[in-house]
Amino acid sequence: MTLEQYGFTNFFKEQKIAATSSYGRVTAVFRDYYRVITENEEFLASLKRGNFYELSSTSLPAVGDFVEVSSDAQILSVLERKTVFSRMNKDSEEQLIAANFDYALIVMSLNHDFNLNRLERYLTVAWDSGATPIIILTKADLVEDLTAFAQQLETVAYGVPAYYVDNLSHHGFEALERDLKPNSTLVLLGSSGVGKSSFINSLAGTDLMKTAGIREDDSKGKHTTTHREMHLLTNGWIVIDTPGMREFGVGFNQAGLETTFSDVEELAEGCRFHDCSHTQEPGCAVKAALEDGTLTMQHYENWLKLQREMAYHARKNSPALARQERDRWKVIQKSLRTHLKTRPKK
């Protein structure tokens, strides 16, 4: 086994490390240790604490990271990343999930898990990661007519390739395998029970992952993946599995949102006011599209929701933005008090 088989390309080879160190890739993350594979072996490594003491949590190694590792199994540094997937927790802190992948596979099942709002959220973080998003719709055998699902995807994921697969019959995998570049790293995103583990087994051609069935009463799956882990498949693809995430916060980088909602962003360019909030201003092209049916209310409301969420996280992480928002509301409240004092009495 060579490190090149684990995606060690020139981008990482050109990043210099000490002559006494080795290049490695993190294949699993545990509480206090990291599983690392190098050119010669695979072992558990720990952080050299002094090198990471004052760094943020996003500077710590994640599954998929290439690292500099010492002869005594200590991680000395993390190499520059090509792509990264993170999420915001309830305290508006960024949590790193995976790094250095080529494709972000958004896995949803064609049962009660299929949710356009959640799909738009996943697409936002997938585009923001820098990787190519792909939609995987599992349990296609449960649906007789896929037309309705295809039409819904057109409204929120235009241009993003979607594959309808059946993990049992292997239907749909030939097209996916034909389109994926060889030796690529894939990260799987999706809720628990959508069939991510079964999907990996089908892609690998063997029972690599432990799987569990779904409850018949609500079509929800049992949770089988408990930590983030990388797998090298015999066909050359590298797969990063992640625990199911039904709800997660988006960050405050607008790039992913603008790509996912490119149709709304294009409409917004036609608004009369450059700072239009797209809620009540005259001459709003977005509101006009709502009225004539060009834009659906669900798509619009989810866009606004994610916009507000990003703005909230940005303020939480930027004292200047938080202060600016407080000052804005002070002006609004002052104007309201002045209006109430000067309005004619009845």
UniProtKB/Swiss-Prot annotation:
GO BP: any one term? ribosomal small subunit biogenesis
- Subcellular localization: Cytoplasm
Q: How is the cofactor bound?
A: Binds 1 zinc ion per subunit.
Asked if NAD is a keyword of the record, the answer is no
Look up keyword Cell wall biogenesis/degradation and say if it applies.
no
Annotated Zn(2+) binding lies at C271, C276, H278, C284
Q: Where is the CP-type G domain?
A: 93-248
Q: Which domain of life is it from?
A: Bacteria
Sorted keywords for this record are:
Cytoplasm, GTP-binding, Hydrolase, Metal-binding, Nucleotide-binding, Ribosome biogenesis, RNA-binding, rRNA-binding, Zinc
Q: Which Pfam families match?
A: RsgA_GTPase
A single MF term (Gene Ontology): metal ion binding
EC class name: hydrolase
> Per its Swiss-Prot or TrEMBL entry, what cofactor is needed?
Zn(2+)
What role does it play?
One of several proteins that assist in the late maturation steps of the functional core of the 30S ribosomal subunit. Helps release RbfA from mature subunits. May play a role in the assembly of ribosomal proteins into the subunit. Circularly permuted GTPase that catalyzes slow GTP hydrolysis, GTPase activity is stimulated by the 30S ribosomal subunit.
Task: Say which family it is in.
Answer: Belongs to the TRAFAC class YlqF/YawG GTPase family. RsgA subfamily.
Protein's recorded name: Small ribosomal subunit biogenesis GTPase RsgA 2
Native source species: Listeria monocytogenes serotype 4b (strain F2365)
Q: Gene symbol?
A: rsgA2
